[in-house]
Amino acid sequence: MAAGVQGESVARNYAEALLVLARKADDAEGWGALLRQVADAINNDVNLSRFLESPRIAAEQKSVVLSKALGDKVPHLFLRFLQQLVKNRRQMLIPAIATEYETLRDAASGIVHARVTVARETGDEEAKMIAERLSKATGKTVVPHFAVDPSILGGVVVRVGDTVMDGSLRRKLGMLRRRMGGTRA
């Protein structure tokens, strides 16, 4: 697990560095989209993933391939960033860097993502109302990501970063049971 935490920290550092470069180029959105495309390609193309992971292929060779594939399609500094990742043997962190980049970019724009668990599918109006209430409660623009879990019985469970707001019927019934001194039936 420590390697995962260390990988996240390293990914965040690279994401911060790329965001600084992207802001200097006045294109944080565009660079984020490019990074996401590269990350998706790595995640979805087994051959590309194997190529980048292979210790038998020199970093210089990988950089040349990146340059030929992306050279005229991406900003020079973006390509240099990817080549530096390859040189530092961090190319397999690109998907994690993309996620961290998006999180940092959104946070700077006052946008947070919330995991919203509901007992049943929500309609568009209900989803909009939940997003508006969360935005009002957090003072930020909330982008909800819905998941259905019938075991919560009703209500919602919201996770924004490390904060969990449990308004589920299951929790409320559990609290009532404890207050009444009852045990679980």
Curated annotation (Swiss-Prot):
InterPro entries: ATP_synth_OSCP/delta_N_sf, ATPase_OSCP/dsu. One of its GO terms (cellular component) is proton-transporting ATP synthase complex. Keywords: ATP synthesis, Cell inner membrane, Cell membrane, CF(1), Hydrogen ion transport, Ion transport, Membrane, Transport. It holds the Pfam family OSCP. It is a peripheral membrane protein. Belongs to the ATPase delta chain family. This is ATP synthase subunit delta. It comes from Gemmatimonas aurantiaca (strain DSM 14586 / JCM 11422 / NBRC 100505 / T-27). The gene is atpH.
